[in-house]
Amino acid sequence: RSSDLWHAGIAVKSVLPQLKGSISVFGTPAEEGGGGKVIMLENGAFNGVDAAMIIHSANETVVNDISYSRTDIIVDFFGKGAHAATWPEEGVSALDPLLLLFQHISQMRLRWNGQGTILGIISEGGEDPIHIPEHCQGKFTVRSFSMKTKKKLLGDFLEACEAAARMTGTTWQWKEDGYTYEDIRN
């Protein structure tokens, strides 16, 4: 809740007469995928700031937390559309590699030892079950406790995309979606 942030600001302000300096309170709307803090940083909101706190509502008090390193990805697979009932042999499903990718991610989790995760959704999976989809899309987020590990997970993920496309005779492309976040440690 944003009210937690404002209450913390009021509490710190109450002891300011004993301290030198000033206090500023920033809210970051649309933080999940919106790049709130990154945009504010790029526009100088934190210039001259000596100390910063991140406050996030939770059902418990957490003092020593880590904000994940994160990159959001959009992956598109391209096949050849066809009528599934009449000419299925003419089609190359763009959905098949996307489904394989999700299976591959599930298996890769076993190797990551809790150091990160890849989460995703099918954002475009075709329009009608009777048509073999020519294009399908997934949206993913790659997250880890460190940029180094996140880069490794991202590399594993892109290799899985390539493998899924090769296995199904499709093509693919990817792009970053939004802002990359570095890990933040207390």
Name what the model sees in each region.
Residues R1-H7, M53-I74, L153-F157, C161-T170, ...:
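Short N-terminal signal/transit or membrane-insertion segments
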